[in-house]
Protein backbone atom coordinates (compact mmCIF):
# COMPACT_ATOMS: atom_id res chain seq x y z
CA UNK A 1 0.00 0.00 0.00
CA UNK A 2 1.29 3.48 -0.84
CA UNK A 3 2.36 5.90 1.92
CA UNK A 4 -0.52 8.25 1.05
CA UNK A 5 -3.03 5.43 1.51
CA UNK A 6 -1.45 4.51 4.86
CA UNK A 7 -1.72 8.14 5.97
CA UNK A 8 -5.37 8.37 4.89
CA UNK A 9 -6.21 5.23 6.88
CA UNK A 10 -4.33 6.50 9.92
CA UNK A 11 -6.02 9.92 9.70
CA UNK A 12 -9.41 8.19 9.55
CA UNK A 13 -8.56 6.12 12.61
CA UNK A 14 -7.34 9.19 14.52
CA UNK A 15 -10.61 10.99 13.71
CA UNK A 16 -12.46 7.96 15.10
CA UNK A 17 -10.27 8.14 18.23
CA UNK A 18 -11.07 11.82 18.67
CA UNK A 19 -14.80 11.12 18.27
CA UNK A 20 -14.79 8.13 20.65
CA UNK A 21 -12.57 9.44 23.44
CA UNK A 22 -14.95 11.84 25.14
CA UNK A 23 -14.69 12.52 28.85
CA UNK A 24 -18.02 12.70 30.73
CA UNK A 25 -16.31 15.35 32.89
CA UNK A 26 -12.78 16.24 33.90
CA UNK A 27 -11.52 17.57 37.20
CA UNK A 28 -8.23 17.59 39.07
CA UNK A 29 -8.74 14.03 40.33
CA UNK A 30 -9.46 12.75 36.82
CA UNK A 31 -6.36 14.49 35.48
CA UNK A 32 -4.22 12.99 38.24
CA UNK A 33 -5.63 9.51 37.64
CA UNK A 34 -5.04 9.76 33.88
CA UNK A 35 -1.56 11.22 34.31
CA UNK A 36 -0.64 8.52 36.81
CA UNK A 37 -1.91 5.87 34.39
CA UNK A 38 0.40 7.21 31.66
CA UNK A 39 3.31 7.45 34.10
CA UNK A 40 2.74 3.88 35.37
CA UNK A 41 2.88 2.54 31.80
CA UNK A 42 6.05 4.53 31.14
CA UNK A 43 7.77 3.32 34.30
CA UNK A 44 6.76 -0.31 33.68
CA UNK A 45 8.01 -0.17 30.08
CA UNK A 46 11.08 1.96 30.97
CA UNK A 47 10.03 4.85 28.71
CA UNK A 48 11.71 8.20 29.23
CA UNK A 49 8.86 10.66 28.76
CA UNK A 50 7.37 13.90 30.02
CA UNK A 51 3.60 14.13 30.56
CA UNK A 52 1.37 17.20 30.72
CA UNK A 53 -2.37 17.40 31.24
CA UNK A 54 -3.64 20.97 31.04
CA UNK A 55 -6.79 22.94 30.52
CA UNK A 56 -6.48 26.07 28.40
CA UNK A 57 -5.57 28.22 31.37
CA UNK A 58 -4.28 25.79 33.96
CA UNK A 59 -1.92 22.82 34.31
CA UNK A 60 -3.51 19.91 36.18
CA UNK A 61 -0.74 17.29 35.95
CA UNK A 62 2.93 17.13 35.08
CA UNK A 63 5.40 14.28 35.47
CA UNK A 64 8.62 13.08 33.93
CA UNK A 65 10.18 9.64 34.07
CA UNK A 66 13.83 8.61 34.06
CA UNK A 67 15.31 9.44 30.68
CA UNK A 68 13.14 12.47 29.94
CA UNK A 69 15.04 15.66 29.16
CA UNK A 70 14.47 19.40 29.33
CA UNK A 71 13.79 19.27 25.59
CA UNK A 72 10.79 17.02 26.25
CA UNK A 73 9.29 19.70 28.47
CA UNK A 74 9.70 22.26 25.71
CA UNK A 75 8.06 19.87 23.20
CA UNK A 76 5.10 19.53 25.61
CA UNK A 77 4.55 23.28 25.48
CA UNK A 78 4.76 23.46 21.71
CA UNK A 79 2.44 20.45 21.18
CA UNK A 80 -0.04 21.92 23.67
CA UNK A 81 -0.15 25.14 21.63
CA UNK A 82 -1.04 23.11 18.54
CA UNK A 83 -3.93 21.30 20.24
CA UNK A 84 -5.16 24.62 21.68
CA UNK A 85 -5.07 26.19 18.20
CA UNK A 86 -6.67 23.36 16.19
CA UNK A 87 -8.60 21.25 18.78
CA UNK A 88 -7.37 18.00 17.18
CA UNK A 89 -4.59 15.47 17.74
CA UNK A 90 -1.13 16.69 16.83
CA UNK A 91 -0.36 13.41 15.09
CA UNK A 92 -3.43 13.85 12.91
CA UNK A 93 -2.01 17.21 11.81
CA UNK A 94 1.40 15.62 11.16
CA UNK A 95 -0.23 13.17 8.76
CA UNK A 96 -2.52 15.77 7.17
CA UNK A 97 0.29 18.28 6.64
CA UNK A 98 2.67 15.54 5.40
CA UNK A 99 5.73 17.81 5.61
CA UNK A 100 9.27 16.47 5.79
CA UNK A 101 10.48 19.61 7.61
CA UNK A 102 7.96 19.05 10.45
CA UNK A 103 6.87 22.68 10.27
CA UNK A 104 3.45 24.08 9.49
CA UNK A 105 2.94 25.55 6.04
CA UNK A 106 4.03 29.20 5.94
CA UNK A 107 0.49 30.48 5.30
CA UNK A 108 -0.52 29.30 8.78
CA UNK A 109 1.94 31.83 10.27
CA UNK A 110 2.86 29.56 13.20
CA UNK A 111 6.32 30.12 14.65
CA UNK A 112 8.29 26.88 15.04
CA UNK A 113 9.48 28.15 18.42
CA UNK A 114 5.89 27.94 19.70
CA UNK A 115 4.20 25.25 17.58
CA UNK A 116 5.51 21.71 17.06
CA UNK A 117 4.22 19.60 14.21
CA UNK A 118 4.80 16.38 16.11
CA UNK A 119 2.60 13.61 17.48
CA UNK A 120 1.80 13.21 21.15
CA UNK A 121 -0.83 15.87 21.82
CA UNK A 122 -4.46 14.83 22.16
CA UNK A 123 -7.52 17.01 22.86
CA UNK A 124 -9.49 16.66 26.08
CA UNK A 125 -13.05 16.70 24.80
CA UNK A 126 -15.76 16.82 27.47
CA UNK A 127 -19.33 15.83 26.69
CA UNK A 128 -21.47 18.95 26.35
CA UNK A 129 -18.48 21.30 26.63
CA UNK A 130 -16.18 20.51 23.69
CA UNK A 131 -12.39 20.67 23.77
CA UNK A 132 -11.19 22.17 27.05
CA UNK A 133 -7.53 21.16 27.16
CA UNK A 134 -4.97 18.58 26.12
CA UNK A 135 -3.07 15.49 27.19
CA UNK A 136 0.51 15.65 25.94
CA UNK A 137 3.38 13.14 25.95
CA UNK A 138 6.91 13.74 24.69
CA UNK A 139 9.95 11.49 24.58
CA UNK A 140 9.13 8.68 22.17
CA UNK A 141 8.86 8.61 18.39
CA UNK A 142 5.77 10.68 17.58
CA UNK A 143 3.48 7.79 16.65
CA UNK A 144 4.37 6.05 19.92
CA UNK A 145 3.73 9.27 21.89
CA UNK A 146 0.29 9.39 20.24
CA UNK A 147 -0.45 5.72 20.86
CA UNK A 148 0.50 5.97 24.54
CA UNK A 149 -1.89 8.89 25.07
CA UNK A 150 -4.71 7.15 23.19
CA UNK A 151 -4.22 3.93 25.15
CA UNK A 152 -4.37 5.70 28.50
CA UNK A 153 -7.31 7.95 27.58
CA UNK A 154 -9.25 4.97 26.18
CA UNK A 155 -8.70 2.99 29.38
CA UNK A 156 -9.65 6.02 31.47
CA UNK A 157 -12.97 6.64 29.70
CA UNK A 158 -13.86 2.93 29.40
CA UNK A 159 -13.16 2.41 25.70
CA UNK A 160 -11.25 -0.52 24.18
CA UNK A 161 -7.70 0.72 23.50
CA UNK A 162 -6.98 -2.17 21.13
CA UNK A 163 -9.98 -1.35 18.93
CA UNK A 164 -8.89 2.29 18.76
CA UNK A 165 -5.15 1.72 18.28
CA UNK A 166 -3.35 2.76 15.14
CA UNK A 167 -1.88 -0.18 13.23
CA UNK A 168 1.89 -0.58 13.42
CA UNK A 169 3.71 1.73 11.03
UniProtKB/Swiss-Prot annotation:
Pfam families: HbpS-like (PF03928)
InterPro entries linked: PduO/GlcC-like, PduO/GlcC-like_sf, YBR137W-like
Leader peptide range in chain numbering: none
Recorded family membership: Belongs to the UPF0303 family.
Protein name: UPF0303 protein BMEI0598
Species of provenance: Brucella melitensis biotype 1 (strain ATCC 23456 / CCUG 17765 / NCTC 10094 / 16M)
Amino acid sequence: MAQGDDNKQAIGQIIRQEQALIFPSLDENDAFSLGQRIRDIAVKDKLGIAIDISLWGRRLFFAATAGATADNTEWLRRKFNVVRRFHVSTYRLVLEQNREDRMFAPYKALDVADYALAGGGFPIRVSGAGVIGAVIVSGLPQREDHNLVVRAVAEHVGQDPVALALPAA
